[in-house]
Amino acid sequence: RIDQDDRIALLGQNGEGKSTLAKLISDRLRPMAGRVVRSSKLRIGYFAQHQVDELHIDETPLDHIRRLRPSKTPAQLRAILGGFGIGAEQTETLVGRLSGGQKARLSLLLATLDAPHMLILDEPTNHLDIESREGLVEALTAYSGAVILISHDMHLLSLVADRLWLVKDGKVTPYEEDLETYRKDLLSTEK
């Protein structure tokens, strides 16, 4: 069960199914067996690092958001972009010329534009500089919906997550220890 104010970190080694679970929860992947139960009114925002590669490189950030909000004025669209750290200069820059961090901010903006009840973030700090990571932490802390995080960034997880779930051997179980214990467990299994 996931409640609206949950901040859940999915833990597990590479290949254990964290991203697959995130895709199942967000309805980006159909289950091979069983079912996923969710409210028909539930809106889920999903951000994965590969989405940065799905942006239209021959368009500007303003073009991307204008397509989704055609009734908004250019000033309103620029204000939305500015709220995600995409400044006036970048709004008219082709996405192909933006930095990795700027592309990641645009992708995150697009994932949250419809005010989802839940955000699922799969490796959200890849491509982000330190300032952008701090901004992400602030945004996630202020966000009123549920958050599910997959990240190797233990610092991010320690600042955002209040529940830990371990994905291992095809099962998801609450992880009752803290992140430092998990990190030590990981290091001991790698030896």
Language-model features and meaning:
Residues 1-191:
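ABC ATP-binding cassette signature C-motif
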